[in-house]
Amino acid sequence: MLQRFLSLILCILLACPSYTQTIQDTPNTDLRRFFTQAGATYLIKYPHQTGTTITLPPNVTLQFQGGSIAGKLVFNNTQLNGNVKLQGSSISGTLKNKTFNAKWLCYADGKKDDATNINAILAMCNEVLFPKGTYLLESMHKPPYKINKPYHIGIHRSNIKITGEKGAILKTKTKAGTLCIYSKPKDIPHSIHDITIEGMTFMVQNESTEWDPYQEHCHTVSLIGVNRCTIEKCTFRNFWGDAICLNHYGDNTSTGERARNMNVVIRNNQINGYKCCNRNGISIINGQNVIIEKNQLTHTSHSSMPGAIDIEANDKAYTVDNIQIRENRIDHSQGKNGAISVISNKEGAPAHHIEITNNKITNSRRAFRFYVWTDYAASHITVKDNWVDKNTDPWVWDGKGRTQNWVFTGNTFLRKTNKKFGQDVRFEGLTYKNNRLK
């Protein structure tokens, strides 16, 4: 019988008894005779191995404190196995539709590495709650598929919810990504799905004020081929590349599109780059049906990088379609393109059905940049009811491509632009009205 390490702390608390008996193991404990008392707490301080499947009594609490069990446990006809070491902070979750509370070896002290155990938790649990504490991430996730940069944490299965209590911080120091959520390449119909990240704080200890090209692709949260994902009420403090990147596998015309991000909501997040020594706040390189709303983005983007929100596919193999950017507050975006940019490059990268509405942009290098180089690669772009302060240059249009069906209405600018509207872009179907210069 193939055995997997069960080194997780499993507190299965379906009913709390008024009195809890605590039973501790010894180096010679026979597990077949150890678990007999319903409602008891069992302390596992020594390593054990058994070829017998152990059935747990009801309402027990297992606390692994340096010990482990190599074997299989069964509770309420549900088999529990895994490979997590333990002791430390509480995390709750579900496993095969059974609800439990667990104490894992997550030190949450900001000094000792928690990445290995968090990866193991996410391999087992569908719902994970991080209590208040600083979870230092040093070790790396080992992905089954090649991704462009190393990440500390990886998720490559569906139906995962991560929730952070106030003060729950995932902290990194190394030039690596924090969290990558990714599907198997070349299998878009079976992409992983239904991922929620809520209330977490992501902090990168980036002390640099000099731009290092390597860090451009070290994103805090990266999605590669994810369907139905929500990231909300999170805080991103400092970051190397992007705070959030809707990413890809480096696809091109020869490989075809190997992964696509679909039905993504990024809402009510606080994104602060601190020293403007990062790439973008949010990048959409590959995305379909994406909503970015009510986020606050400040101090994002090195002067050589695009800006706070960048919609920019790299190749015509990607999909960028039905993107809604609305009611965001952007301040001190110092990227070369603008606070919000839509780029369709010489390779014919697509940008279709994009709505940029009701955003407020202040103290930034530029509000908007639209770059259309290839005929009809970009179409149906709406820029409506945005407000731009006097410290921010309004726009740049660039490129020589033909583009269709633009609406530019109801925007308020407190400063003139020195750029000719549209530059050399050739519009086929443009509505330009009710824009105000105060």
Region roles according to the model:
Residues 49-61, 69-87, 118-125, 136-163, ...:
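Extracellular beta-strand-rich solenoid/capping regions of secreted or surface-exposed proteins
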Residues 21-45, 103-131, 137:
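Acidic Gly/Asp/Thr-rich repetitive segments characteristic of extracellular carbohydrate-active
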Residues 37-39, 57-59, 75, 125, ...:
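Parallel beta-helix/beta-solenoid
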Residues 94-105:
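Short domain-boundary/entry signatures in modular proteins, especially
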Residues 69-92, 403-438:
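Leucine-rich solenoid repeat scaffolds
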Residues 1-22:
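Bacterial Sec-dependent N-terminal signal peptides
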Residues 70-74, 139-140, 171-177, 206-212, ...:
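Short glycine/acidic-rich loop motifs that flank beta-strands on beta-rich extracellular proteins
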